[in-house]
Structures are given as C-alpha cells and as structure tokens.
C-alpha cells in the first residue's frame, strides 16, 4: 500500500469519523435540550392555567375548576367542585349561595381564566416578598348527597407574612341544601325546641371534645352552648359540626365533632328535615 494512503487518507478518514461522532452527540444534546425546554414551558403554562375536570356523585354531575397563582405580592389557590351549569334552577340557587356573589357558576371557568390572566399580566419578577404579602386559599366540595339533600364544605384560609398583620383566618363553612327547594337547612330546623334537650346535645358534644383532648370532663361548669354554631352537615349515619380559627380558643384546636344518628333521635324535631330523612314520618 502506498505510504501516502497510510499516512494521509487513513488519518483523514479517522478524523471524519470522529467529527461525525462529535456532531452526532451535539445534535443529540440539542434535541434533549429542546425537549426539556418544551416540557418545562408546558409545565409552567399548565401550572398557570385553570384546570377543569368533570365527575359525578349520586346522579349529579359536577365540574371541578382550580388554579394556583403565586407572586412576590400574594399567592392564591382556588379549587371549586360545583354542579354543572344547567337549567335546574335549584342547583343554580345552591351554587349562588356557595359562591356568595364572588363568582357566577354559569361562567365560572371563563371568570377564573380572566382572573388568572390578569394576575399573570400584572406579575412582578421581584423575588423579595412584599411587606403585605398574603396567602389565600378557597375550596368548595360536595361531601354528601342523599335523601333529597346535598351537603358542601367550603374551606377558606388567609395568612399574612408580616407579624403586624391580622392573625391567620381559616375554617370550614358547612351547608346542607334541599335538592327540592334549594333552601339551606338550619340548626333550628333539626333540633326540637326543648331547652333541656338542646343542653343534653351540647353537653354530649363537650364530653366528646374532652375525650378527644384526653382531659377531664368539666362540662358541668362550662357554658357548652358555644358548640352550637349552625356550622354543620349530616350524612346517612351522623351529624358533623365544624369549628374554625375563631373558635379554637374554646375547642383547643379540635376542628370537628360528630354525633351518631341513633343517639340523636330523642332530641330531633320530629317534623324537621333530619328526623324525616333518618327515621321517616313519625307515626
């Protein structure tokens, strides 16, 4: 073999092969970089959008709308699961009561998109949190459907970064509605009017509270009526009361108390919605 082939062409071919290998790796790295960039951008866009999904509970169709936003000025989280907009005026009335005029269920998804878009467009890139920085969260979800009733728990929280700001607020607001009228069921409707019976129920709840806290039951020397706060819902088996930040001093951090159906029977209004749902018409 001529020497010029040995010392000229072969090295050149090796050089070309190595160059192709390097170029191939570079192109592979570029492709990986582009893929990762697309994934990151997609994830960011998804996190900055309103997520929606549909579900069904006991024959009622619901739509879940949620988003999370955070900036140096504030953060906000919304998570609503409400009946789908329909011609059913009763469900619309219930949604109006739950949203308290802040949003319209018939245009909820678009309203949340508009709200989030305005937050994004006004977002500042300053990494230092503002002096009045605050975090808010609001969720609404159904917890029970049955017997012609639907129950929701609306959870809200707000806290501030500044030590001089108001104390954090949080709590669960419960509501039970009639699926026939859309009317919210009140505490006065479910219990009878006998004062002694009302005291027995409150005293029972306080005893339950003491058991949870593993403390001595001092209910005979305490005004236990504070446990009636009209913040309740019921299921097929029990009555549940909820307590929030304004009641923590009295409940020592306990947020929920419940009483069983069987125990409550003697103290319910026999003409009220809960008695009729649990035990039928009294004969």
Protein language model annotation of sequence segments:
Residues 5, 13-16:
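Short hydrophobic targeting helices and cationic amphipathic motifs
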Residues 24-34:
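Bacterial N-terminal signal peptides that target proteins for export
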Residues 33-42:
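Bacterial N-terminal signal peptides
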Residues 17-21:
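Low-complexity, intrinsically disordered or signal/transmembrane-proximal segments
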Residues 48-283:
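Compositionally biased intrinsically disordered regions enriched in Thr/Gly
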């Amino acid at each position: 073999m001529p020497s010029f082939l040995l010392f000229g062409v072969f090295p050149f071919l090796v050089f070309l092969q190595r160059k192709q290998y390097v170029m191939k790796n570079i192109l592979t790295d570029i492709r990986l970089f582009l893929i990762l960039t697309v994934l990151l951008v997609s994830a960011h866009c998804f996190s900055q959008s309103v997520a929606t999904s549909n579900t069904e509970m006991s024959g009622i169709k619901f739509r879940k709308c949620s988003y999370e936003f955070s900036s140096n000025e504030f953060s906000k989280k919304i998570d609503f699961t409400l009946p789908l907009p329909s011609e059913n005026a009763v469900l619309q009335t219930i949604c109006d009561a739950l949203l308290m005029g802040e949003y319209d269920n018939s245009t909820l998804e678009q309203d949340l998109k508009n709200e989030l878009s305005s937050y994004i467009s006004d977002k500042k890139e300053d990494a230092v949190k503002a002096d009045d920085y605050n975090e808010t969260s609001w969720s609404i979800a159904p917890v029970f459907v049955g017997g012609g009733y639907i129950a929701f728990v609306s959870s809200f929280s707000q806290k501030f970064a500044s030590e001089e700001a108001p104390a954090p607020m949080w709590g669960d607001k419960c509501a039970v509605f009639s699926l026939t009228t859309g009317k919210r069921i009140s505490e006065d409707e479910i219990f009878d009017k006998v004062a002694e019976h009302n005291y027995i129920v409150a005293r029972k709840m306080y005893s339950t509270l003491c058991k949870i806290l593993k403390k001595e039951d001092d209910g005979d020397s305490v005004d236990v009526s504070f446990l009636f706060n009209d913040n309740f819902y019921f299921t097929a088996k029990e009555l549940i009361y909820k307590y929030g930040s304004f009641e923590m001093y009295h409940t020592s951090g306990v947020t929920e108390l419940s009483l069983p159906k069987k125990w409550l029977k003697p103290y319910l209004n026999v003409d009220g919605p809960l008695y009729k749902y649990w035990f039928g018409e009294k004969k």
